[in-house]
């Protein structure tokens, strides 16, 4: 997710000698990615991409804290000026506002009632909001957007006098309930959504996502409820995606915002409303906090940090980095005890997470490149993992003149292979036409071929397909698909491709069985299991279960001494019924004599086939007299066992 942050606003919390460009370069190298800097008048606005696991950086304060750790490691001075508020008493109940909640739905709720004068915001607030891409509305609404960008927790304002019974009853929605959001759009709720009603069943807020039109601040508003809620982010995301409401508040809340920053956010909002809306607090601050964040500490030794990173980082540097990031650190001899601040409890779990924080802030670019030390006796070998074999196969296809394609995992109904009731359908697809997860690669690769005007095409793709199961999650399986479109292409092109791939993987037990469904082609068999198929229609297509194939991959090379004596080669032409597979014929002929070295299919015309037979002895040179009885035995096998007619 991207946010816009003005440099002038950031300077309220960060004191540094880095120029805007130097700031952007240093942060992009070790932290967030600053994609663009735009000069706006005398100010600079940073366009910052924040990764989904760091909602704590979706604010001015969060970026300032992060920069105070990063910049000193890049040679700049940087001081974080923390956001502080005075201690403020709170209560769980108030006569002016009744809030009932479900602990399974909310982590924390805070609210306060204020009298205000509603009017336009001062210029500095509207200017700052405009630079962050937010339209100024009025001083009450603008304050909620302002404190969200500054501190990082969304908030909302209700018109207090439009709340029937002055009640907020937080509950799960019922399927079919309708709401009209503050932008005037009507939605039918799917059910199980987190909502607030007025105590009589009328929904007045879609919590954490968007307010409703029946409780929003209007021109005549005199009293407001400043409201902050921290909810079950899994339910919230589901609602947001189902309804297609992707407000910044929804996106931020679904990441799991830190509930401990709610009090400073609320107090800051109150102070801004006092200053710019002549606000008077007319109720206690309500604070309902059933699911408090549990503190977490992680221990890691200095030796482990140095071992994992590969260089020795001074102890003081480690402490400075961690403390600048907001962690509490105590050191006892060689061990660091790190207290995880609440904004990072969902992100930092194990010692390696701490080490990663130290390494990235210190700067990966400052760690010298070096090979691992090996002793003379070390038995070094390259691990032949899945990635290795896939790269070998891809390189081979490119060498053979194939083009690799990448297609979408989501497909239309037309590109789903088989009955549509077997398809995995998304509840919230990004586009209406692509709603199904593919169960085969071939239809998509053929679709790519159809969009190409060339008549001679050789395409391949290696990617995952998704197979529905009766119970549990679907299977995600790696497949290879090949499409050959050229003049005079035949089944044997596909067969040759499969055999060549098997050879690269060191597999010698691939076999083929004629398809039983009447389609011209063959099933690909390995260890008695069907792992794919070849089909010869308008195009020659191959699809193989790569995961099954790789289980048998073997990098061990078996050396055979070359024969010292020349082979004898004969061609045998026969007419043979089409239903006999070559693999079966080859097996029978090779077993007829130990001198039959190899059998290959040289030519095919309808049912007429020409086999090339290579005879070889490793002890002597063969003569025509040696092979005559073997040749007679081969002819007998072909005529009796395979009903062939010699040509």
Model-derived features: positions:
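RNA/tRNA-interacting regions in translation and RNA-turnover enzymes
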Residues: 1-386, 393, 488, 610
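Short flexible coil/turn linkers enriched for glycine and charged/polar residues
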Residues: 4, 40-42, 105-108, 332-334, ...
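A carboxyl-terminal module marker
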Residues: 4-7, 20-22, 324-330, 337, ...
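Glycine-rich, charged/polar anion/phosphate-binding loops
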Residues: 96-99, 179-183, 206-214, 252, ...
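Short histidine-centered catalytic/ligand-binding loop motif
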Residues: 130-136, 251-258, 430-434, 480-491, ...
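Class II aminoacyl-tRNA synthetase-like tRNA-binding/catalytic domains
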Residues: 168-217, 305, 369, 373-476, ...
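An acidic, glycine-/histidine-flanked metal-binding catalytic module
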Residues: 246, 266, 270-280, 478-497, ...
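His/Asp/Glu-rich mid-to-C-terminal helical/loop segments that flank catalytic regions of hydrolases
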Residues: 260-278, 448-453, 457-460, 628-634
């Amino acid at each position: 997710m991207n946010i816009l942050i003005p440099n002038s606003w950031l300077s309220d919390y960060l004191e540094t000698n880095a120029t805007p460009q130097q700031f952007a370069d240093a942060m992009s190298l070790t932290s967030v990615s600053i994609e663009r800097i735009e000069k706006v008048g005398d100010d600079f606005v940073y366009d910052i991409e924040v990764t989904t696991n760091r909602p704590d950086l979706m604010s001015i304060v969060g970026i300032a804290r992060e920069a105070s750790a990063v910049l000193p490691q890049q040679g700049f001075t940087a001081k974080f000026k923390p956001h502080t508020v005075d201690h403020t008493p709170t209560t769980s109940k108030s006569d002016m506002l009744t809030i009932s909640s479900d602990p399974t739905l909310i982590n924390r709720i805070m609210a306060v009632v204020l009298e205000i004068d509603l009017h336009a915001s001062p210029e500095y607030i509207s200017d700052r909001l405009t630079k962050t891409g937010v339209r100024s509305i009025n001083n009450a609404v603008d304050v909620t957007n302002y404190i969200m960008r500054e501190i990082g927790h969304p908030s909302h304002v209700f018109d207090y006098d439009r709340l029937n019974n002055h009640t907020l009853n937080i509950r799960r929605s019922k399927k079919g309930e309708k709401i009209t959001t503050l932008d005037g759009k009507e939605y039918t709720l799917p059910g199980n959504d987190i909502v607030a009603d007025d105590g009589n069943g009328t929904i007045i807020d879609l919590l954490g996502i968007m307010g409703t039109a029946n409780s929003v601040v209007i021109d005549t508003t005199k009293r407001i409820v400043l409201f902050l809620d921290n909810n079950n982010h899994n339910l919230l995301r589901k609602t947001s995606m189902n309804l297609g409401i992707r407000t910044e508040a929804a996106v931020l809340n679904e990441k799991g915002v830190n509930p401990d920053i709610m009090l400073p956010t609320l107090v800051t909002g109150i102070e801004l409303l006092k200053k710019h809306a002549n606000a008077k607090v007319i109720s206690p601050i309500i604070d309902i906090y059933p699911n408090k964040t549990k503190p977490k500490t992680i221990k890691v030794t200095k030796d482990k940090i140095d071992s994992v990173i590969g260089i020795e980082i001074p102890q003081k540097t480690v402490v400075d980095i961690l403390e600048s990031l907001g962690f509490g650190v105590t050191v006892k001899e060689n061990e660091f005890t790190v207290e995880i601040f609440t904004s990072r409890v969902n992100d930092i779990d194990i010692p390696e997470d701490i080490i990663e924080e130290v390494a990235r802030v210190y700067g990966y670019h400052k760690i010298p490149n070096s090979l691992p030390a090996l002793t003379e006796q070390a038995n070094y070998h390259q691990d032949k993992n899945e990635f290795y074999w896939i790269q070998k196969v891809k390189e081979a296809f490119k060498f053979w003149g194939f083009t690799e394609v990448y297609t979408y995992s989501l497909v239309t109904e037309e590109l789903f292979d088989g009955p549509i009731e077997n398809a995995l359908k998304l509840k919230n697809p990004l586009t209406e036409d692509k709603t199904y997860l593919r169960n085969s690669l071939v239809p998509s690769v053929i679709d790519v071929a159809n969009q190409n005007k060339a008549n001679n095409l050789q395409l391949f793709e290696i990617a995952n397909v998704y197979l529905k199961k009766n119970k549990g999650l679907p299977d995600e399986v790696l497949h290879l698909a090949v499409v050959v479109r050229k003049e005079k292409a035949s089944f044997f092109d596909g067969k040759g491709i499969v055999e060549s791939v098997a050879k690269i993987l060191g597999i010698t037990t691939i076999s083929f069985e004629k398809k039983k469904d009447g389609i011209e082609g063959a099933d690909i068999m390995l260890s008695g299991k069907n792992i794919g198929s070849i089909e010869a229609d308008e195009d020659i297509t191959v699809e193989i279960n790569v995961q099954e194939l790789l289980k048998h991959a073997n990098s061990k090379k078996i050396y055979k001494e070359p024969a010292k004596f020349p082979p004898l080669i004969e061609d045998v032409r026969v007419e043979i019924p089409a239903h006999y597979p070559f693999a079966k014929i080859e097996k029978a002929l090779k077993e007829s004599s130990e001198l039959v070295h190899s059998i290959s299919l040289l030519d095919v015309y309808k049912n007429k086939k020409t086999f090339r037979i290579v005879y070889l002895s490793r002890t002597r040179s063969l003569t025509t007299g040696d092979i005559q009885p073997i040749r007679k035995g081969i002819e007998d096998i072909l005529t009796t066992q395979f009903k062939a007619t010699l040509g």
